[in-house]
Amino acid sequence: MKAGVVHAKNDIRFEEIKTPVPEKGQVLVKVKYTGICGSDVPRVNGDACHFFPNVLGHEFSGVVETVGEGVSSLKPGDRVAGVPLVPCMECEDCRKGNYSLCKHYSFIGSREFGSFAEYVAVPEKNAVKFEDSVSFEQGAFFEPATVALHGLLRTGYQGGEDVAVLGGGTIGLFTAQWAKIFGAKRVTVFDISDERLKLAKKLSIDNGINTLEEDF
């Protein structure tokens, strides 16, 4: 299969590598869409890549191609979105259900090969099925959308409040949209990019302020 392989700092190559075979409890996903996260940038041009060669990419959607032994909830042809965090399920935090605090976690597209490739093998629980009414492009946004929702819920947000979002990148704009969905009185996005603020307006965010140009 073809993949974008990081061989060293500032050295990423589009080349042929072996197509993974799903192990027990895994599914093989044919990637349809994948996003480039801000965290992928230092993994290529910084010192954040865990090993070389590596295949990045953790925001993705696709179709189940084949399933490994023991897989029961998914079948070939299912449309799925990827969940990159792979907790060990054995440490104290995992046993309490605090998977994001796992001491021995893996992460698709960082600590193991990810979705900058034609295919990616993931645990069954890390492939979330979605309906035909959801496009593959939308499905690839599942992961950043949930990151934004988690952040908003951690603030103790209540509907009817005014909400300020500092930064109108992907996560910021998702946060603003979630706030609107849950009944925010008014949502304001602060950024230094007019392009991002125009997108915020297109997404029906109440107000956008360029902090380089406006005194607030």
Task: Please tell me what each predicted stretch does.
Residues S39-R43:
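Cytochrome P450 core scaffold surrounding the K-helix E-X-X-R motif
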Residues K2, Q26-L28, D162:
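Residues that mark the start of a beta-strand
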